[in-house]
């Protein structure tokens, strides 16, 4: 049986995040087990760290597609220490230069593909086919359990990088 339930705590559709977090909270409450919240971009980094041979000074830049030329991205070192906190970035040829001028930067995730043509610095490296997988949560969840880094089941909420803005449909069903 599970000693804790873990859940992604960042980026995704608003409804999907709410449903997933509500389900995890219900399971934790009902089974009286702790809740662990894991940053999606860190989970996305686990297969890169496990299966790719990176230089010691490499920086990691996981990216999630946020539509148009925007991505949700953060920059980490190989120990997943935050070098730049998550932000919604509109990517252009000057994006991430402060990091690219200092070290090799590895871009991956479903937002990285659309950035390949824009980010052409010699220190920019792109890794294809990296997706957030539940099994990649385990190493991070294990560390959280060791630290007893549990979330309050009653008050935990997903991190919404942007505010939800509801809009009216352009066409009415009556038209």
What do the predicted segments below correspond to?
Residues 1-8:
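Short, small-residue-biased leader/transition segments that mark boundaries at the very start
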Residues 30, 47-51, 78, 140-147:
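Active-site catalytic microenvironments for nucleophilic, acid-base chemistry
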């Amino acid at each position: 049986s599970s000693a804790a339930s873990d859940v992604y705590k960042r980026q995704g559709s608003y409804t999907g995040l709410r449903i997933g977090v509500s389900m995890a909270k219900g399971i934790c409450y009902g089974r009286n087990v702790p809740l662990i919240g894991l940053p999606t971009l860190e989970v996305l980094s686990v297969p890169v760290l496990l299966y790719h041979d990176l230089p010691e000074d490499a920086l990691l830049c996981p990216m999630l597609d946020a539509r148009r030329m925007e991505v949700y991205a953060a920059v980490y070192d190989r120990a997943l220490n935050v070098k730049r906190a998550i932000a919604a970035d509109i990517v252009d040829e000057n994006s991430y230069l402060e990091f690219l001028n200092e070290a090799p930067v590895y871009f991956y995730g479903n937002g990285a593909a659309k950035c390949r043509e824009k980010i052409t610095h010699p220190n920019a490296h792109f890794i294809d086919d990296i997706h957030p997988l539940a099994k990649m949560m385990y190493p991070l969840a294990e560390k959280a359990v060791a630290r007893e880094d549990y979330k309050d089941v009653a008050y935990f909420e997903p991190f919404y990088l942007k505010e939800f803005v509801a809009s009216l449909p352009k066409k009415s069903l009556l038209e």
